[in-house]
Regions:
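Acidic, surface-exposed loops and disordered segments
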Residues: 1-173
Length: 173
């Protein structure tokens, strides 16, 4: 059984090299909106989506992420947009909620010809004093916890073939 949506899921790949070309605002808005339709525990909508296109904040968040990673490379692979997903840490499902938001946006981006890669370490960033300072600067509650981020932009190269699916990935009982 195959249809366009199933094909979309099966052809999405992580992109780790981006063109410098900006993402049109209509495309960015469409990707962001799909995140707001992700399922959340109890329908409580615990996540907050932060789209970073400002070069100053793009550099700052990359620096903070690289510090956590112990590297001096760009953890967002040169993508022109970084989308952070944080969520209310008091929600028992904040990680699951934010993860669903990230996946919705990654699939939407692929549908629009954009590339993404999920980037970790946002929890460490926003649990730190530097991260809390950013939240204060952005006038966001300090109860927000990092879930993850996606780098977003036009892929600089064609996506490769998927790895073979592992044996016993699915077990029917």
């Amino acid at each position: 059984m195959e249809n366009n949506f199933l094909s979309l899921i099966k052809t999405r790949r992580s992109v780790r090299a981006y063109k410098s070309e900006p993402v049109p605002s209509e495309a960015l808005d469409a990707v962001l909106e799909t995140g707001t339709y992700a399922p959340t525990g109890g329908g409580h909508q615990s996540p907050t989506i932060i789209a970073i296109t400002d070069p100053k904040y793009r550099r700052e968040i990359a620096k903070l992420n690289a510090e956590v990673m112990g590297s001096n490379t760009d953890p967002y692979y040169g993508a022109p947009v970084v989308i952070l997903v944080l969520a209310d840490g008091s929600a028992s499902t904040f990680v699951e909620d934010g993860s669903c938001v990230l996946e919705n946006m990654m699939l939407a981006a692929h549908a629009l010809g954009l590339g993404t890669v999920w980037v970790h370490r946002e929890r460490e960033i926003f649990d730190s004093e530097s991260g809390k300072a950013l939240l204060r600067e952005w006038k966001l509650p300090e109860t927000l916890r990092g879930v993850g981020a996606i780098a977003l932009g036009y892929p600089a190269q064609e996506a490769g073939q998927p790895a073979a699916r592992k044996q016993n990935y699915i077990v029917r009982i």
